[in-house]
Amino acid sequence: MNSTSTATPIANENHTPMMQQYLRIKAEHPNEIVFYRMGDFYELFFDDAKKAAKLLDVTLTARGKSNGEPIPMAGVPYHAAENYLAKLVRLGVSVAIVEQVGDPATTKGPVERKVMRIVTPGTVSDEALLDETRDNLLVAITLKDERYGISSLDMGSGRFTVFEVADEEALIGEIERLQPAELLAPELLTVPNIISLRAGYRRRPDWEFEYDTAQRLLTRHFGTQDLSGFGCEDFTAGISAAGCLFAYAQETQKTTLSHVAKLVLDNPETKVTLDAATRRNLELDTNLAGTEDNTLFSVLNTTTTAMGGRLLRRWLHSPLRDIYILNQRQSAIEALLDNYQFEPLRHTLKHISDLERILGRLALRSARPRDLSRLCASIAEFPAIQQHLNGIDSPLLKKLAKEIREFPDLVDLLSRALMENPPVVIREGGVIAEGFDEELDELRAISTNAGDYLIKLEEQERAKTGLSTLKVGYNRVHGYYIEISKSQASSAPTEYIRRQTLKNAERFITPELKTFEDKALSAKSRALAREKGLYDDLIETLNEQLRELQVAASGVAELDVLTTLAERSNLLNFCKPELYEGEGIFIEQGRHPVVEQVLDDPFVPNDLLLDTDQRMLIITGPNMGGKSTYMRQTALIVLLAQIGCYVPASACKLGLVDRIFTRIGSSDDLAGGRSTFMVEMTETANILNNATRNSLVLMDEIGRGTSTYDGLSLAWACVEHLANNLHAFTLFATHYFELTGLPKALAGVQNVHLDATEHNDSIVFLHKIQPGPASKSFGLQVAKLAGIPSNVIADAGGHLRRLEAQPTVDTPHQFPAPEPIALQEPVAEPEPNKPAAAAKTKPASPQPDLFASAAPSAVEIKLRSINPDNLTPRQALQALYDLKDIS
């Protein structure tokens, strides 16, 4: 097959009528794979077929010709289409679903077909296509007036948000938080690779992000004069993004989005800022290997409903700075812990289905019979929830009790209307219960009694004709018939009308049987039509109370999270933190909530104090001693407190922080073309440019990605900037022991260390925070534990003793104060009329001369004078010739 000629062509008279129809539809949807319904299959053609064959592992065949070449074709069975759609959606591919809407029996030429829906990664609502544990978000971004506008829509729940951020780093952080399934951006907007290379990234025409168009669209949908009621009328960039997003959602869903009831201003100023590096380093819901194992979410998530699990994930990624809301959540957890009142509530909540997404499908008119059945069973549990909440003294729980109100009329309606175990789809009927509709019951009775009638007719005709081989039957092609064997067919009565000849029998029809056939077949089709009409009526009736049902579903999700946090706090021995508006972090016997769960040995808890007099701790100690764990547990305790949860400690008092920053670990950014050190410096720059005195900063091993003195200088300067200018609460872990002298020079800075001890030629990590700097790093002992060959360890020990014997500017813990070390002084120029030898000379380098060598050669001197970044190609070639001449 010639792959160069299989691109989708333009329809012309050389194509069959069916293919012309397909090509017209495909021309309208060039960016989607088109699933074209033909009988029991969805067929794909041309490039779509080739792409599907590769992505879905289906067979690539051919059908007919275009421009003299075979047309590539692939197909998937209609009944299994959802599985294939799910796979494409996960790969970030959009699909246009084309259905037959005409009647083949009455249509001349190709059956009429039209696009019934467009399935995109960010707009799917079908249960089979979604991960119930994660939000499935459509997000749009744009840039206006030097601010990034961001809007998100959860099609399943109808949650629609808008907000703005000031810079690219904040944009990356928000995309990391939202984890969109599909991301829309203007064609001309330049974004970092970390965003543009995401699966589901779509470029849209710039005109789709026009502010005036967006405002008209949104005010028309919400039925308002302007957007001031949502508090976002001044967010030009945000509204522009929201307009593009909403238009795209309407276009793909082919319906009004009635479940999108409001636009929420998701104001970053009310939340703790977490950048992308912090979310990654703290492993909130994804570990560094890319899975959920051993994450904070995995430890906390014992939610009983899918929507509760999704809300808990959102809380972890959006800690709050509103002390009123946090105190309300704490009080609710405290009330639920009283007499273990969370237990009966959790037992009841287990019976509640994913109401958010069921209601989303209800609003989109795509709800299936089992959705309605689960909705009925779920809202039937609301009275029990009301009973459990009655009498619990908590303002937040009382508010939720009002939201999760009873719906007795809907429970009664759905209980009467639906079969006990309805089928998956309405197509074949069997959904509406007997006794709900008299007309439907009558039509069903005709079909149900057909079997009895045929038995009686067969007995009657055998007795009347005396033909022993006579029998009455039915098939889909020829309908009802009387069948008589060949040997007796000639004795058939004259009123028998021949219908079909078989090899060994003849089939007949009689006027009486034809009358019954018309009535029975008509009754079946009329029953299906009646049932479909009743089902649609149910959908409309439920949509009349959609807003109240959405509020109740939201209340159930929040109640689920609160009862889960109560259960976790009880089982994991968490304490209630004291929150206040001032500055300071006090943690007594703090623990890492995740590490504690995976250790076989008891976790060693540690204290922490940061306040107005002690704002920074310089942490030293051996690798594997627990420095990173101590730092991370501090951040996680603060984060848990600021979602309103209890924390893993014996006591905690916290002044709310506005941001949490982490510079921990090492990794490169191949897609962005950044080295490990460049990533480290970029993250450090973000901290130094954006941290405030109310921020919590964790910095681990700053400067290790470059030479010793470059790294030491950078780490030193970072400590000074954080202490003197930003005054942020900081945990600064380092192996540069020279930095432990800084507390003598900088106010509010103290040394602490995690200790270890040597025992029988091995090392024992104590994991306990102690005041003061560490005495040694134990690097060789850790290397030995890691399995480094003994001869290498021995050689390293010799090198270490030689290096330690060499004089340096400072030994550990003798950092000069207050004047900083001149790590490298320039050579002074000779004064006029004074011998050069009398000028100030450059002192010996304080860094040990590890590998003494001869003076540099002329070639080396020449090479050092060349900056390759500033050379033109011609200059580079000339430099090469010069070097050749020198050598």
From Swiss-Prot:
Q: According to its UniProt record, which protein family does this protein belong to?
A: Belongs to the DNA mismatch repair MutS family.
Alphabetical keyword list: ATP-binding, DNA damage, DNA repair, DNA-binding, Nucleotide-binding
What InterPro entries does the database record attribute to this sequence? DNA_mismatch_repair_MutS, DNA_mismatch_repair_MutS-lik_N, DNA_mismatch_repair_MutS/MSH, DNA_mismatch_repair_MutS_C, DNA_mismatch_repair_MutS_clamp, DNA_mismatch_repair_MutS_core, DNA_mismatch_repair_MutS_N, DNA_mismatch_repair_MutS_sf
Annotated spans, Disordered: 828-853
Give the Gene3D superfamilies listed for this entry. Answer: 1.10.1420.10, 6.10.140.430, DNA repair protein MutS, domain I, MutS, connector domain, P-loop containing nucleotide triphosphate hydrolases
Q: Which organism is it from?
A: Saccharophagus degradans (strain 2-40 / ATCC 43961 / DSM 17024)
- Pfam families for this protein: MutS_I, MutS_II, MutS_III, MutS_IV, MutS_V
Q: Name one GO cellular component term.
A: cytosol
UniProt GO molecular function: ATP binding; ATP-dependent DNA damage sensor activity; damaged DNA binding; mismatched DNA binding
- Write the protein's name: DNA mismatch repair protein MutS
Chain intervals with Low complexity compositional bias: 834-848
Residues binding ATP are: 621-628
One GO term (biological process): mismatch repair
**Cited function:** This protein is involved in the repair of mismatches in DNA. It is possible that it carries out the mismatch recognition step. This protein has a weak ATPase activity.
